[in-house]
Amino acid sequence: MKTLYSLRRFYHVETLFNGTLALAGRDQETTGFAWWAGNARLINLSGKLLGAHVAHAGLIVFWAGAMNLFEVAHFVPEKPMYEQGLILLPHLATLGWGVGPGGEVIDTFPYFVSGVLHLISSAVLGFGGIYHALLGPETLEESFPFFGYVWKDRNKMTTILGIHLILLGIGAFLLVFKALYFGGVYDTWAPGGGDVRKITNLTLSPSVIFGYLLKSPFGGEGWIVSVDDLEDIIGGHVWLGSICIFGGIWHILTKPFAWARRALVWSGEAYLSYSLGALSVFGFIACCFVWFNNTAYPSEFYGPTGPEASQAQAFTFLVRDQRLGANVGSAQGPTGLGKYLMRSPTGEVIFGGETMRFWDLRAPWLEPLRGPNGLDLSRLKKDIQPWQERRSAEYMTHAPLGSLNSVGGVATEINAVNYVSPRSWLATSHFVLGFFLFVGHLWHAGRARAAAAGFEKGIDRDLEPVLFMTPLN
């Protein structure tokens, strides 16, 4: 079989350049990579690489199913989800499964079904992974040319990219169909304190959807993280799904333009670096989304956001002191600013004290008390409902903060519950993983560019300890 590899060099890096695809073994002699380099041994063995990826998918889905069932087994319906260390059930609840008004869990059976379906799926994937890793063909190019590929074949690579985009688009539309036709999703903004509802009136206006992308990422604007109604979220998924599917069809039908052929590095390691870079961006965006957004991640399931807990504390003490006779409209705090209420630089009435930094918080329990110019003093005096007091006291004592210092006052809250919020878990894990993926992106991009330029020498392996050890087998 004619290969597309240059004969420029013979170093053990990135892709083999020794002009052969006949790599029978998966050992260091034939591949240039030792056993611990994992899938690097399989760079030119498309069948075995398929097995590794399918088996990896099986492990991922097995974790999802097992962890799902573990959370179901430990779940106490009387306690809020966020007090129980759950990270999967809140996602299922947000999709509208098993919950009723106010986010109360009324049926855990859908959660059980989800766990079992994932376990069964993981068994299928696990079998497929073992089959392709051990029994299937080493390479797919000869027997299944549709699934075969050569890393330098630009046209085939963009076809594979197109297939991936179409699958992502279908995934986006699955959420749309769930929201529109299959029972709806949980809306924290539903009147009366949140409920599952079908989304009927989608936002499809491009000026609204793409307007989010043009917003500043800073306070008061918040880029796409500022989305606060489900019509926009589901409408955004219609746009995103459509773009992914049409983009996928485009990439399948076309060949890369000349500028793209010149600008990009076309090797397996380069594609790995591009993917890691994209995943890194996704991780950082997800971190901000779960930390700040209480619409896509309802506080009923994930606990309050940091700003929400801080504003809830200010609200709780405003209610208390107002009952004790304080005039919350004019009371001065220790700094000379308003103790309970003050004005933002743009003139809105906002909560005073340390929580002033979170003046742009929007939350379902607080919005009914706002007027055209921020918080409405007459509503604060006459219209506060018991459910708002209960909700804010609950959120005040469940700040997602651990024991940081400058946190809008709530770290000193003596009634706080000692727990770790799922928001903290999800935000920190996605930030850390996003950072590691970024480092991996830089590493593999550097290696891929050097290999393409022809000056990558690799690590000098003459004195490598592993070469002096007896073989594992």
Swiss-Prot record:
SUPFAM superfamilies xref list:
Photosystem II antenna protein-like
Protein name stated in the entry: Photosystem II CP43 reaction center protein
Q: Give the originating organism.
A: Carica papaya (Papaya)
Q: Name one GO molecular function term.
A: metal ion binding
What domain of life does the native source organism fall in?
Answer: Eukaryota
- State its location(s): Plastid, Chloroplast thylakoid membrane
Q: Which residues form a coiled coil?
A: none
Give the stretches traversing the membrane. Answer: 69-93, 134-155, 178-200, 255-275, 291-312, 447-471
Biological process terms from the Gene Ontology for this record are: photosynthetic electron transport in photosystem II
